[in-house]
């Protein structure tokens, strides 16, 4: 499916730090970010993986991930949508990011054509079932205004990283007037962090 998607003229896919058994010291440098930026004004970020177990109706265990939708009609320079875009660009341009493939000829392969058709049919089925949610949603009605959104991340290089997010959270918490509310699918705290 990645070949099918990346064969589209408007799609580029890069791999972050592709696993290389000849460089085992880099294998722990993984990227687990999940975000989608649309039109430079809206983004979704969260913890949802793109496997059926995490999406849709999967029998058995239900997994409830937290996604955040941010809508900004007129983003200013220091707005979080621009912060996220700059973060994306920094990762995209890293030496450790390489194109999934560079061959336009792949689109002519029968297996890729089949994958493209399956993706198109899957989207059409999804659209038919969810048409009302997709077309008739007033996002202004379903969101609430914030004074500020602060996006945090640990370093994005592939070497060992300092855990700077906890320090950044601590600095933000020092500025709280009444309480602190953290919305994240990722945080796992130890005893020291709870105190």
Where in this protein do the model-derived segments appear?
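Charged, low-complexity intrinsically disordered terminal segments
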Residues: 1-14, 18-34, 38-195
